[in-house]
């Protein structure tokens, strides 16, 4: 292969890798955006998300979209990312036919000009479309679950648990619906993590997010409920909002307000601000912010909370609808509510076309309030209640026309009651029908205008009105829907009920909180009492010797400055207990086990006092010699052959020149200071003895003689004249002989240790280990003299170290040497 071919191959490979790495990726497929169903002879519009494709090079780069293989009736606008068109009836000849077709969506990354193509599926059908029912009123539904903003939103407190349940009857062609979806409004994105949708019950449930500021304006979240007759697509959507804020600006008005003009066309209407609430109380003038007209015609004006204007003559006429508009009302925190208005010229007495059914809880007090805004001219209208079915028991319910209140005690066996609300004005009469439906006890949602919830079902009306009003409650237009609300005269009753509820809550809190505190205190006391029973007082516990301090350098005299290694003989700290060997050996620290003269007190601490007065950290081996040869004259000490070992400073774990190391307490130093005239032996000795020597006490197999005498060290600082003892013959180690020899030796020591000042020293130098041998007599050990050394193989080794450090038990694997003899 030539160099040119290799170069071209590498270039192609690099280009391919570049395409693989830098190609835009599919972030939000069109299939998950639930595109609408295209229906013949109906307009089709669908805007895809700008996050359908994302750049893999620059996350902020915008993707440019283009579409291919579109049918003739469908077009795509790249600038707005919108599909639009209208399929003709010729496309599908048979009834109830569905046709799927594919389109190719191309996305180009503006960062590096790379592209991504994907194929997506759309559908067109000639099935009858699904739409909203004419009597559906979104505000009337949301009012059952809390306060509203007067337009299309439910107001929530931060961290409030809520649910909103929709009714299947709000859709037409209900039998053709196969699926329901709950999504976010923008591009039908998934719901946030604090909101859930149950497609079986059409219920949104969740907990409102937290607001971190008490003065921050409210935040709106838009959602949709989608109904479809083709899986994976959308047929009709109902949009609503959840508004969360630190303060709640709400209204109890749940329908469009009707302004009925006279033949002159003059308009004058005061805004019903007494139906506006801030944090559950009627809003005061100092808390009011701006008031604005929205989508109003030029001839409508707003002045000091009053709507005024004059309808043009060409718009006047019987049952005409000259204008629809809204008014936004803000508070000082930036929260907003809306009033929706319809200007009409009509002879109708009702401003609404139907009334919803009302739920009543069996065995409880029932009350419901109608709104003056439900009438076109409430001041000049007489309102009454009629019972349409005389066979039903209706004696329990009463109607007060003065405040439009319906109230009574619901019977326990109540099922249903059919009623009609009748409006009369002169010779004109109009009536709307509704039902009161009995329900079992359940938790209801309180509001400003009613203590009972309401549901929607089929409605009937005898109204002769023929006008159609547009509402602001849904994304898809529908006819004006029914609503209920309270009258101004009913406000005192509602406030009274609210005050009663607050008192009941206060009483409940006053009882429940102290009981809760007492219960918590009792639980804490029981827990404390139980722990006290499981853990008795310290004075009842047995006194135990504390465990050894593993970090105390005195416990490791040979490991100072040593290289740390993993010690195979180390014990796990968790394994220490009161019966462990380490604790038992630690108890031996209180015994005087040093190999000193028997004349010393067993609890004497004079040695330690003298050691502490010396102020030196080293000792002289001449005071601790255990071999008679050490007491004889020696030639001057030559420098050690090994740069590491010093015969004058031997460790208890090492032999030098086949000589045993001295046995010294790790608390002992040999540089003793002069004995004071006043010496107290009242302190317990803390000296210890080597554990291996302590337990290695076996009687020799046979008695041997030696010509060496038992001699006290001539280097003792308290004895300048010590005479050698006569040679003694070995005897059978009977108790009598052992005692006799021991007493004779002690007498010789006492005779030879009289100082110039007549002071008998308390501490004597250690006798030779060649002469005294422990012999077991029954359960006790006695010391006898051995005339000849009994040499046996020792387990200790003569070692060499390259690091010139002291001996560390953890370094046993690195030690090399020979095994010497041991006395």
Curated annotation (Swiss-Prot):
Residues 530-823 are cytoplasmic. Residues 447-467, 539-576, 596-627, 700-734, 751-771 are annotated as: Disordered. Residues 449-467, 760-769 have a biased composition (Low complexity). Keywords: Cell membrane, Glycoprotein, Membrane, Phosphoprotein, Signal, Transmembrane, Transmembrane helix. It comes from the Eukaryota. One of its GO terms (molecular function) is calcium ion binding. Present with 396 molecules/cell in log phase SD medium. This is Axial budding pattern protein 2. The lineage of its organism: Eukaryota, Fungi, Dikarya, Ascomycota, Saccharomycotina.
């Amino acid at each position: 292969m030539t160099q040119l071919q290799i170069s071209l191959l590498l270039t192609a490979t690099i280009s391919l890798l570049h395409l693989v790495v830098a190609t835009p990726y599919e972030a939000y497929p069109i299939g998950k955006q639930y595109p609408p169903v295209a229906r013949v002879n109906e307009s089709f519009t669908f805007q895809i998300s700008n996050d359908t494709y994302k750049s893999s090079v620059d996350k902020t780069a915008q993707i440019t979209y283009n579409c291919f293989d579109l049918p003739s009736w469908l077009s795509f606008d790249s600038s707005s990312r919108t599909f639009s068109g209208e399929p003709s009836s010729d496309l599908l000849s048979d009834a109830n036919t569905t046709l799927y077709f594919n389109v190719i969506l191309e996305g180009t990354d503006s960062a590096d000009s790379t592209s991504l193509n994907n194929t997506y599926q759309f559908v067109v059908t000639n099935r009858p479309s699904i739409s909203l029912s004419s009597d559906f009123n979104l505000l009337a539904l949301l009012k059952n679950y809390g306060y509203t903003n007067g337009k299309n939103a439910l107001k929530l407190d931060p961290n409030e648990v809520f649910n909103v349940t929709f009714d299947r009857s709000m859709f037409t062609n209900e039998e053709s619906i196969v699926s329901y979806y709950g999504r976010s409004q923008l591009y039908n994105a998934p719901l946030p993590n604090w909101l859930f949708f149950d497609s079986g019950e059409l219920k949104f449930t969740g907990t409102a997010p937290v607001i971190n500021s008490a003065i921050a304006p409210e935040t709106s979240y838009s959602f949709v409920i989608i109904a479809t007759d083709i899986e994976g697509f959308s047929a009709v959507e109902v949009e609503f909002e959840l508004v969360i804020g630190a303060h709640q600006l709400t209204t109890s008005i749940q329908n469009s307000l009707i302004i009925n003009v006279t033949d002159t066309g003059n308009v004058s209407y005061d805004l019903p601000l007494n139906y506006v609430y801030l944090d559950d109380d009627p809003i005061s003038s100092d808390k009011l912010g701006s008031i604005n007209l929205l989508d109003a015609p030029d001839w409508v004006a707003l002045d000091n909370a009053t709507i005024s204007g004059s309808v043009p003559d060409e718009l006047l006429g019987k049952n005409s609808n000259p204008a629809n508009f809204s008014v936004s009302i803000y508070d000082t925190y930036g929260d907003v509510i809306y009033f929706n208005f319809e200007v009409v010229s009509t002879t109708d007495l009702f401003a609404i076309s139907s009334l919803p059914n009302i739920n009543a809880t069996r065995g409880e007090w029932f009350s419901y309030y109608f709104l003056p805004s439900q009438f076109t001219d409430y001041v000049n209208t007489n309102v009454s209640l009629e019972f349409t079915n005389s066979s039903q028991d209706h004696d329990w319910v009463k109607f007060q026309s003065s405040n439009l209140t319906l109230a009574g005690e619901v019977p326990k066996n109540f099922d249903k009651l059919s009623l009609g609300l009748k409006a009369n004005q002169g010779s004109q009469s109009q009536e709307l029908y509704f039902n009161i439906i009995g329900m079992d006890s359940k938790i209801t949602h309180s509001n400003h205008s009613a203590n009972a919830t309401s549901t929607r079902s089929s409605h009937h009306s005898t109204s002769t009105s023929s006008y159609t009003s547009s509402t602001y409650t849904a994304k898809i237009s529908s006819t004006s829907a029914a609503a209920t609300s309270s009258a101004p005269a009913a406000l005192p009753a509602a406030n009274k009920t609210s005050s009663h509820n607050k008192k009941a809550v206060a009483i409940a809190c006053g009882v429940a909180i102290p009981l809760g505190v007492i219960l918590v205190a009792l639980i804490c006391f029981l827990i404390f009492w139980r722990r006290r029973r499981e853990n008795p007082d310290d004075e009842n516990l047995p006194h135990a010797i504390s465990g050894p301090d593993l970090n105390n350098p005195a416990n490791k005299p040979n490991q100072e400055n040593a290289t740390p290694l993993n010690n195979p003989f180390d014990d796990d700290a968790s394994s220490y207990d009161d019966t462990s060997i380490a604790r038992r050996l630690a108890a031996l620290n209180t015994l005087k086990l040093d190999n000193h003269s028997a004349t010393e007190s067993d609890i004497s601490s004079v040695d330690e006092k003298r050691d502490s007065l010396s102020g030196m950290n080293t000792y002289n081996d001449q005071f601790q010699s255990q071999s008679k040869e050490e007491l004889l004259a020696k030639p001057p000490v030559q420098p050690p052959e090994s740069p590491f070992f010093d015969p004058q400073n031997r460790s208890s774990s090492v032999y030098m020149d086949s000589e045993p190391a001295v046995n010294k307490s790790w608390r002992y130093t040999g540089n003793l200071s002069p004995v004071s005239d006043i010496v107290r032996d009242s302190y317990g000795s803390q000296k210890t003895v080597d554990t291996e020597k302590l337990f290695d006490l076996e009687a020799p197999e046979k008695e041997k003689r030696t010509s060496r005498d038992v001699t006290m060290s001539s280097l003792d600082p308290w004895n300048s004249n010590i005479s050698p003892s006569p040679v003694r013959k070995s005897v059978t180690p009977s108790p009598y002989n052992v005692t006799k020899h021991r007493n004779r030796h002690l007498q010789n020591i006492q005779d030879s240790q009289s100082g110039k000042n007549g002071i008998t020293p308390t501490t004597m130098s250690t006798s030779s280990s060649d002469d005294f041998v422990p012999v077991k007599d029954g359960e006790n050990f006695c010391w006898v003299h051995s005339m000849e050394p009994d040499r046996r193989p020792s387990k200790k080794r003569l070692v060499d170290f390259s690091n010139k450090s002291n001996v560390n038990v953890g370094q046993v694997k690195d030690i090399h040497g020979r095994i010497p003899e041991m006395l």
